Amino acid sequence: MKRTFQPSTIKRARTHGFRARMATKNGRAVLSRRRAKGRKRLAI
């Protein structure tokens, strides 16, 4: 059985990156929540 986590920086950025978050309404909500919480890093 292969391991489920096969790291790829491109895939990571495209699904969890800042521009991906900004693309949808819910993604922007995620960023605003993280800003409100005071996260040092908003996205990957």
Curated annotation (Swiss-Prot):
One Gene Ontology CC term in the entry: ribonucleoprotein complex
Regions crossing the membrane: none
Cited HAMAP family: Ribosomal_bL34 (MF_00391)
The species this protein was found in: Pseudomonas putida (strain ATCC 47054 / DSM 6125 / CFBP 8728 / NCIMB 11950 / KT2440)
Claim: Ribosomal protein is one of the keywords in the record: yes
Any single biological process term in GO: translation
Keyword terms: Ribonucleoprotein, Ribosomal protein
Protein name as it appears in the record: Large ribosomal subunit protein bL34
Top-level taxon: Bacteria
GO MF entries: structural constituent of ribosome
Record's keyword annotation contains Ribosomal protein: yes
UniProt family annotation: Belongs to the bacterial ribosomal protein bL34 family.
Pfam families: Ribosomal_L34
Gene name in the database record: rpmH
